């Protein structure tokens, strides 16, 4: 086992803090600053005999009142305090530093202490602890903590800190001193404190049988939100059970508390005490929709997973962030979603990657998954999280599920409560399973790859065999080539058939690791029947995050839509047919024949019966306009939009009666909050989008009936398809429909968020004006993360045809908001700006308008350095060819 000290030494650290005792004195007005006394036990990591370097502690914005070493108060000449560090030249090989400071409240990104009305909280990842006290604020350093918080209980009635409550006492002035002990060593970025007006709900967990320490799951929230904790209290025990069944380490604490903090930026997995924006933890008791429940599931799964995987072995440096975040997205977040929703949920992973991460690949600031940077905030990207998960997923595909479980379990055990690097994981896996070591190492080169490979797969039937040629078609210059695992199956009219792969193994699926620019393999029949009539399904399960082009005919793709057992392969074939139809329309050729093949394939699949409503919903969802546009050097906003409109209308006509029947076959369960209920409601929006595009009065009547239904989670799914309907097809004016919704749901903020999303994501010609009105109206609150996402996320990241209105007005109103938000919530803004970052890929008129807005961003006050650097880099590019 690699100890925490050994891990820290490998990071290059000369000093190590193994214990921290804090006294945090909160005044009646916390915004005036907080007095923090810290006693930090520090020792040298250098071998005896080596000259000791000065001890340098990290700090930001601290007012220093006293510095002492082993009880000796240092004079002004015995230490040097700068705005960024505290330097002590003559520090012994082992000693205790005592500092007394006033720490600021508020500041860049609300790091350190932050005050929100009624609540004081901390925000320490990645470098916030240095705004609380002088410290060795590095991720490889782990220390145990004792913390005493002194506060007026009439002002801050609930105090929570990492670890276990160890005592309470009254001070001489009548305030309450609350003490906590955390005996599990943690890096400083996992320190957490919250104090204020919070209620707590909890459930007991029975863990005696499996040796886990965790006995109690608690949720803390402001009194007006606490009734929404019931969903998380019900779903998180299932998440915990799944985590344990799939290799998570035992949780080290008796109590695990999730805290809803209004205005908190997203979610963070502080040790035993996790902080969340309420939108991703509590289901608003006044009303919520399925998206809210899914956010709770995904965020609680992700942050819990850190406790048993991604922070039990933390990162040796911030450049290795993907080790904790990518692995956690894969094994906690995505795997949990598939566990609860079924295999088709893998398609949702692919959609997230395409919509959120792929745009980062084409910007000048596109980060690699792993890399050292001056400001670790720059690493909190979709590339680190989502692409990082896919790279680890490729390693899992190569290893196979059983070997992956053994490798990860032994890795956690080896480095438990220490730190490691991505390379440590790769080498551990390679040593554990040497038969695939070369494939693992070649695939691990993805961690340093900027950009996305593209594959062309050609198949040829020869004498009962199938020859498969896999060829790289991208212009990336990775040398040696990264490994790309390609999962293949020969699919016939009864599903995948067994074949003999190039390794001599008989299976229905073969994984080929392409580690060159081109390779040809042969699949041979397992029986005398041969493989004639089969179709090769490639990249099953989305085995690698690449662009894929295939030589399959429309009829062959249709066979996959009908008979492929892998949900991703089936969905991809339907998407490919849709893409070809849109491209035909853009090229000015007749798309009728291709659309007919797709309609027949989808109709046949519906007639055969699709047991999983989520899979049915995703098969019926048209290709995403962002993915369609992003395939080519120049993004054809208008052509893609027009092609999708034709495809939508044609499928609506062809599948009309089947779609009506599908809705009837999946009626709503008004009380249903199970994942299966959510999956059934997923059907409503894509089915109505096709039906309404047919222009039938029956479709309009059904859509209005759905919208006026009694259950908001289903009713609101009908609003986006109704929004772009022409006035002559909609018997009720659109504004009247919106007014109906407002009348019903005005007292339910989460439902109103969905109501707003439907408007900002609409393809209506007046969407830009509507978004501007919403952003300047009384419903908008820029400090409310959920409300910001409701107005801007659909508009800027899901609605290219409206956002890129030729007037440029969409850009202007959006950049106004970016400039306002970036100084305090850069992490949120990063999720919204994908199209700004690829401005040179649009037509000349749009490029000029986008350039003007980027120039505004580059010179706006309060923009973080990393953002200014990215924007200036983009502006220094020449226009696209």
Task: List where the protein language model places each region.
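Short, glycine- and charge-enriched coil/turn segments that flank and shape catalytic ligand pockets
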Residues: 46-52, 72-73, 167-175, 206-214, ...
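Conserved short loop/turn motifs at secondary-structure junctions
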Residues: 41, 87, 261, 313-317, ...
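Acidic/His-enriched low-complexity segments
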Residues: 1-254, 284, 357-358, 371, ...
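Hydrophobic alpha-helical and helix-loop surface patches within well-folded domains
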Residues: 180, 219-469
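Short coil/turn segments at secondary-structure boundaries
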Residues: 111-115, 136, 160-166, 192-195, ...
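Beta-strand-rich binding/interaction modules
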Residues: 53, 61-70, 158, 435-441, ...
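His/Asp/Glu-rich metal/cofactor-coordinating catalytic motifs and the adjacent surface-exposed loops
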Residues: 421-441, 446-473, 479, 582, ...
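Long, ordered, helix-rich scaffold segments
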Residues: 354, 382, 478-480, 524-881
């Amino acid at each position: 086992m690699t100890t925490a000290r050994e891990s820290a030494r490998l990071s290059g650290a000369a000093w190590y803090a193994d214990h921290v005792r804090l006294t945090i004195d909160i005044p009646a007005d916390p915004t005036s600053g907080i007095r923090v006394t810290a006693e930090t036990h520090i020792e040298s990591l250098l071998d005896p005999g080596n000259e000791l370097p000065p001890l340098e502690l990290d700090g930001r914005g601290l007012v220093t009142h006293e510095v002492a070493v082993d009880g000796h108060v240092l004079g002004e000449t015995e230490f040097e305090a700068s705005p960024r560090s505290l330097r002590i030249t003559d520090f012994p090989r082992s000693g205790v530093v005592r500092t007394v400071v006033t720490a600021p409240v508020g500041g860049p990104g609300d790091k350190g202490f932050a005050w929100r009305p009624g609540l004081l909280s901390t925000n320490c990842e990645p470098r916030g602890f240095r705004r609380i006290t002088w410290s060795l604020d590095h991720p490889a350093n782990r220390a145990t903590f004792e913390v005493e918080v002194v506060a007026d209980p009439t002002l801050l009635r609930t105090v929570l800190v990492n670890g276990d409550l160890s005592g309470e006492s009254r001070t001489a002035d009548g305030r309450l001193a609350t003490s906590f002990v955390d005996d599990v060593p943690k890096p400083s970025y996992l320190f957490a404190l919250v104090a204020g007006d919070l209620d707590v709900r909890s459930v007991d967990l029975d863990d005696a049988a499996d040796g886990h320490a965790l006995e109690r799951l608690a949720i803390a929230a402001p009194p007006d939100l606490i009734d929404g904790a019931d969903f998380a209290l019900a779903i998180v025990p299932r998440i915990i059970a799944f985590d344990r069944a799939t290799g998570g380490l035992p949780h080290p604490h008796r109590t695990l508390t999730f805290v809803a903090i209004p205005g908190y930026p997203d979610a963070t997995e502080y040790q035993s005490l996790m902080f969340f924006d309420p939108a991703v933890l509590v289901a608003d008791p006044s009303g919520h929709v399925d998206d809210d429940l899914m956010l709770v599931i995904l965020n609680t799964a992700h942050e819990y997973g850190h406790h048993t995987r991604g922070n039990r072995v933390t990162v040796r440096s911030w450049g290795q962030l993907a080790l904790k975040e990518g692995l956690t997205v894969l094994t906690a977040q995505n795997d949990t979603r598939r566990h609860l929703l079924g295999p088709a949920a893998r398609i949702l992973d692919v959609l997230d990657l395409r919509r959120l991460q792929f745009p980062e690949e084409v910007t000048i600031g596109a980060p690699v998954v792993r890399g050292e940077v001056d400001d670790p905030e720059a690493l909190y990207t979709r590339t680190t999280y989502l692409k990082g998960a896919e790279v680890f997923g490729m390693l899992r595909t190569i290893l196979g599920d059983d070997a992956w479980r053994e490798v990860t379990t032994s890795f956690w055990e080896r480095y438990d409560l220490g730190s490691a690097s991505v390379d440590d994981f790769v080498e551990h896996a390679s040593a554990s399973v040497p038969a695939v070591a070369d494939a693992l190492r070649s695939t691990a080169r993805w961690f340093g790859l900027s950009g996305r490979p593209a594959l062309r797969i050609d198949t040829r039937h020869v004498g009962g065999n199938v020859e498969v040629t896999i060829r790289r078609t991208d212009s990336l210059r990775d040398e040696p080539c990264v490994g790309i695992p390609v999962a293949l199956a020969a699919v016939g009219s009864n599903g995948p058939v067994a074949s003999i792969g190039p390794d001599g193994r008989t299976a229905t699926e073969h994984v080929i690791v392409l580690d060159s620019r081109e390779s040809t393999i042969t699949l041979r029949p397992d029986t005398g029947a041969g493989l004639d009539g089969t179709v090769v399904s490639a990249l099953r399960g989305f085995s690698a995050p690449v662009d894929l082009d295939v030589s399959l005919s429309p009829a062959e793709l249709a066979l996959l839509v009908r008979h492929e057992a892998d949900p991703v392969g089936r969905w991809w074939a339907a998407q490919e047919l849709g893409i070809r139809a849109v491209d035909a329309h853009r090229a000015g050729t007749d798309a009728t024949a291709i659309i007919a093949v797709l309609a027949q394939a989808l109709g046949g699949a519906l007639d055969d019966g699709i047991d999983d409503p989520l899979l049915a919903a995703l098969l019926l969802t048209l290709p995403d306009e962002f993915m369609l546009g992003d395939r080519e050097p120049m993004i054809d906003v208008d052509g893609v939009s027009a092609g999708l409109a034709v495809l939508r209308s044609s499928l609506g006509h062809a599948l009309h009666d089947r779609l009506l029947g599908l809705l009837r076959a999946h009626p709503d369960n008004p009380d249903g909050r199970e994942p299966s209920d959510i999956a059934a409601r997923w059907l409503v929006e894509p089915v109505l989008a096709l039906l309404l595009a047919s222009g039938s009065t029956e479709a309009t009547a059904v859509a209005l009936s759905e919208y006026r239904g009694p259950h908001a989670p289903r009713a609101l799914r009908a609003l986006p398809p109704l929004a772009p309907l022409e006035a002559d097809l909609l018997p009720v004016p659109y504004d009247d429909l919106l007014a109906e919704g407002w009348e019903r749901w005005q007292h339910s903020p989460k439902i109103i968020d969905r109501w707003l999303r439907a408007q900002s994501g609409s393809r209506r010609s007046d969407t830009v004006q509507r978004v501007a009105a919403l952003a300047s109206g009384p419903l908008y609150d820029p400090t409310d993360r959920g409300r910001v996402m409701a107005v801007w996320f659909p508009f800027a990241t899901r609605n290219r045809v409206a956002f890129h209105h030729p007037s440029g007005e969409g850009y202007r109103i959006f950049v106004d908001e970016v400039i306002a938000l970036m100084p305090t919530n850069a992490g949120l803004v990063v999720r919204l700006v994908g199209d700004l970052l690829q401005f040179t890929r649009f037509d000349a008129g749009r490029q000029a308008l986008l350039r003007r807005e980027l120039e505004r961003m580059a010179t706006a006050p309060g923009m973080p350095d990393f953002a200014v650097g990215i924007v200036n880099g983009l502006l220094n590019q020449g226009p696209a060819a």
